[in-house]
Each structure stands twice: as C-alpha cells, then as structure tokens.
Amino acid sequence: SCFRREAGSYGKDTKGILRVHQFDKVEMFSFVKPEDSGQEHEFILSIEEKLMHALGIPYRVLQICTGDLGVQAANKYDIEAWLPGQPSSTGSGRGTYRETHSTSNDTEFQSRRLSIKYKNPATGKNEPVHTLNGTTFAIGRMIIAIMENCQQADGTIKIPPALEGYIR
C-alpha cells in the first residue's frame, strides 16, 4: 500500500477512487550498470505499454520535462489512460487522459544514499548502480480505466480477454 499526503483534501479529484489517501500499486525495480540505464528505462516503459495493449485500453505516453521531475529522477515517462467518463480537462465534452503508470530513471540518486554498488570490471572499483522504477499498475486507477473503456450499452462491463482467465 502507498499513502498520499494530501489525499482528497483539495483539488479536483476529491471524490471516488481516482485520488485517495491509501492506494495499492504493483511496482517494478531495476538495478543496472550506468551504461545500461537508458536502455533499461525504455524496456520498463515497453512492459507498461504491452500491458496497456493487452487490456485494450487507449493511452498516451508523456516524457516529463525536467522542470516537473522530482529531485531524484533524471528522466521520467508517464502513461495516461483514456477515461471517457471523466469530465474533459478542457471543460468541453467528456473524456480525458489520467496517469496510471510512470517509470523513472533515478541514475545514482538512490544508490549513492544507500551505498548500493557493483564492481566495475574495467576499473576494478566499486561504483554506484543506477536505479529505475516503474509502476506496473496503479490498481484503483486501472479499475476505473477498465470500467470506463469496457462498459457495454446495457451497463455491464466486458472483462478484457487478457484478464478473463483470472475472473470467476
């Protein structure tokens, strides 16, 4: 479980399960040599995209500008799922994209503080690894995305084929 400090105390998402104080998510972590971190970051993003494709949820990928990155991240992507039932972010019509995943390349920020190192075979020295993380699914938000994108005319929800084997 994760906890959000401000949790519905202000802003536009104070009702429902879109933005709650306590939420669950499945996260991926990688520890790699510095020269491999760029490629690993793209690999984590590709896993997140494959999952969205498997569910048939429309989405977009945003590369976050440096001014919006947290102090630890050197590069970050967000995946936003299309939520057709939400009010439009432009104020006209229905539907908007909302973040369901992110992946960050934190380079040495965390490993230096935690003293996580590997022995560099070229130098024989212990050097900091690069750390990366990516959200596989933010559970509540993915439930919203599935419900809104898979609702049938009669109000029922058609479970995506990729999940059918897990539902009884």
Sequence positions of predicted segments:
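TRNA-recognition modules of translation machinery and tRNA-sensing kinases, especially anticodon-binding
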Residues: S1-R168
